[in-house]
């Protein structure tokens, strides 16, 4: 169990692990059960950084640094997926054209605009959190990592290569159930009803995104997983801002 957590951590973050372990290909799909716990680990890092930054910096600067820290510690992997999907949306053509543009290592103008807007929205949504900030910092990366599991399980591969193809088909209902349990229980313990409501909103969005990618591309890719993860981070923060003070 612990080994699978470290497999997930090694894939989702660039946090150094001070020991080596064997990772088999089938471990990648099985490790998705622990994706939300990796999100919680990232949240703990953000909460700790927030405590230290608040000692010396005004909140606007501290929150901007938190967004930067999250991007750095994840290697900007999911932001890259968001940019690629934005470029794919801007490309005129069918499925093959969309996939070809996403695979291109260069980032186009629409991808840059998408990145800037996403980072600004994430920063503004985080800055708008007025209550339960540490609880929010713990929870929103967790919800986004659960969305990766939800999007992946039961999906088809839009193409056979890429990082996403290693996970698609390797995880099943057990991984979704375990990941959902971790996410829902943590959301309830940290935030109560707003946490459950936020998880439900993000889960619904992920279902819609999953259907859209299957209709557009015939399946999902690693870029699609990263894009949906980034959008769910923003959606989670915005939802908590919208409903947090009502309960």
Curated annotation (Swiss-Prot):
What does the UniProt entry say about where the protein is found? Cell inner membrane
Q: What is its EC number?
A: 2.7.8.26
- State one Pfam family annotation: CobS
Gene Ontology CC, one term: plasma membrane
Q: Which residues cross the membrane?
A: 1-21, 37-57, 61-81, 109-129, 176-196
InterPro entries xrefs: CobS
Please give the superkingdom of this protein's source: Bacteria
Q: Name one GO biological process term.
A: cobalamin biosynthetic process
| Membrane topology recorded in Swiss-Prot or TrEMBL | Multi-pass membrane protein
Q: Which GO terms fall under molecular function for this chain's record?
A: adenosylcobinamide-GDP ribazoletransferase activity; cobalamin 5'-phosphate synthase activity
Question: Where does this chain mainly localize?
Answer: membrane
Pathway stated in the Swiss-Prot or TrEMBL entry: Cofactor biosynthesis; adenosylcobalamin biosynthesis; adenosylcobalamin from cob(II)yrinate a,c-diamide: step 7/7
What does this protein need as cofactor? Mg(2+)
Keywords for this protein: Cell inner membrane, Cell membrane, Cobalamin biosynthesis, Magnesium, Membrane, Transferase, Transmembrane, Transmembrane helix
Q: What is this enzyme's catalytic activity, as reactions?
A: alpha-ribazole + adenosylcob(III)inamide-GDP = adenosylcob(III)alamin + GMP + H(+); alpha-ribazole 5'-phosphate + adenosylcob(III)inamide-GDP = adenosylcob(III)alamin 5'-phosphate + GMP + H(+)
In UniProt terms, what function does this protein have?
Joins adenosylcobinamide-GDP and alpha-ribazole to generate adenosylcobalamin (Ado-cobalamin). Also synthesizes adenosylcobalamin 5'-phosphate from adenosylcobinamide-GDP and alpha-ribazole 5'-phosphate.
Q: Which family is this protein grouped under?
A: Belongs to the CobS family.
HAMAP family given in the database record: CobS
Mind telling me which NCBIfam families this protein's record contains? Answer: cobS
**Protein name per Swiss-Prot or TrEMBL:** Adenosylcobinamide-GDP ribazoletransferase
